[in-house]
Amino acid sequence: MITLTTDFGLKGPYVGEMKVAMLRINPNAKIVDVTHSVTRHSILEGSFVMEQVVKYSPKGTVHVGVIDPGVGTERRAIVIEGDQYLVVPDNGLATLPLKHIKVKSVYEIIPDKIRKFTGWEISSTFHGRDIFGPAGALIEKGIHPEEFGREIPVDSIVKLNVEPRKEGDVWILKVIYIDDFGNVILNLENYEKPRTVELLDFNLRLPYLETYGLVEKGEMLALPGSHDYLEIAVNMGSAAERLNVKVGDELRVRLL
């Protein structure tokens, strides 16, 4: 199985081009579209999305992610080999999914080598179609990454700074995802459940509950959410709009 996560959107030929290129290489590939609606150029958001899919995928799954604002530059295209595979630009996209993969080795994809498998020229602006998609299709077909890449040190790959910080009793947390409901997901997991969550930047104290419907419509709350991260929400409303926050913003939070 191959999963696809991109910021291509659904307007235009890009997703279709990528998928037919993959099927040309591997006609029997089973391709799952996770989303093509990651906010444009948002590597952090894409990393979160890929993490959730990796957590529930079987061993051997190939995850292709293309949120690639550095396409055509010196940034590397890589394959991370483990109990699952990540095929991504080396720009930090692998950061969160890596928490759930037992990494064996990492390979830099060599364009000239992969072109021998595809048979077409590589565009400087569409590596999803010409490099990442084909690499994923080849792996799912049984071609080892060393056939089209070179091994590089595991600790050389780029990672985002997504670790929560604590200053006294205050957490400095980052917004790592906002879903279509406007729920705000923060980069804190494995915490002791509080009774109250204080958002210091907004002078708000929120009840910490298990689900949205435990407060009245329009009321704000904090909860564990379905992804094991601390979440801020409004019942039948948008916490992101209420707080005017976006992915990457930092919030000062106290758990009480």
Swiss-Prot record:
Cited InterPro entries: SAM_HAT_C, SAM_HAT_N, SAM_OH_AdoTrfase, SAM_OH_AdoTrfase_C_sf, SAM_OH_AdoTrfase_N_sf
Binding-site list for (R)-S-adenosyl-L-methionine: 183, 212, 226, 231, 234, 236
Positions of adenosine binding: 7, 41, 68, 183, 234
Domain of life: Archaea
EC number: 3.13.2.3
GO MF term set: hydrolase activity
Reactions that this protein is recorded to catalyse: (R)-S-adenosyl-L-methionine + H2O = adenosine + L-methionine + H(+)
Gene3D superfamilies to which the protein is assigned, alphabetical: Bacterial fluorinating enzyme like, S-adenosyl-l-methionine hydroxide adenosyltransferase, N-terminal
Site for Important for activity, residues: 68, 75, 127
Functional pH dependence: Optimum pH is 8.5.
Keyword annotations from UniProtKB, A to Z: Hydrolase, S-adenosyl-L-methionine
Oligomer and partners: Homotrimer.
Function as written in the Swiss-Prot or TrEMBL entry: Catalyzes the hydrolysis of S-adenosyl-L-methionine (SAM) into adenosine and L-methionine. Is likely stereoselective, specifically hydrolyzing (R)-S-adenosyl-L-methionine ((R)-SAM), the inactive form of the ubiquitous cofactor SAM, and not the active form of SAM, (S)-S-adenosyl-L-methionine. Probaly plays a role in preventing accumulation of (R)-S-adenosyl-L-methionine in cells; maintenance of (S)-S-denosyl-L-methionine homochirality is important for cellular health given that the (R)-form is largely inactive as a methyl donor and can function as an inhibitor of methyltransferases.
Family: Belongs to the SAM hydrolase / SAM-dependent halogenase family.
Protein name: (R)-S-adenosyl-L-methionine hydrolase
Organism: Pyrococcus horikoshii (strain ATCC 700860 / DSM 12428 / JCM 9974 / NBRC 100139 / OT-3)
